[in-house]
Amino acid sequence: MRARELRAQTLDQMKDELVKLKKEQFNLRFQKATGQLEKVSRVKQVRRDIARVKTFLRQKINENKV
């Protein structure tokens, strides 16, 4: 997910995206534990996407407070 795309999203869209990414992260961890994970790099990518979404979510919340 690109930063440009995140900036254009609303708070609700970002929250939905965060839930989706957390579910994907859970599934990837489960696949890794059972030895079924094919794309190991996806774990790192999802983790960073979660951090990116949380960062922009916090920025939007702070902008609305001011």
From Swiss-Prot:
One Gene Ontology biological process: translation
Top-level taxon of origin: Bacteria
Pfam family, one: Ribosomal_L29
Any one Gene Ontology molecular-function term assigned to this protein's record: structural constituent of ribosome
Cellular component terms (Gene Ontology): cytosolic large ribosomal subunit
Glycoprotein in keyword set: no
Tagged with keyword ATP-binding: no
Keywords in alphabetical order: Ribonucleoprotein, Ribosomal protein
InterPro entries per the UniProt record, alphabetical: Ribosomal_protein_uL29, Ribosomal_uL29, Ribosomal_uL29_sf
HAMAP family noted in UniProt: Ribosomal_uL29
Listed name of the protein: Large ribosomal subunit protein uL29
Upper lineage: Bacteria, Pseudomonadati, Pseudomonadota, Alphaproteobacteria, Hyphomicrobiales
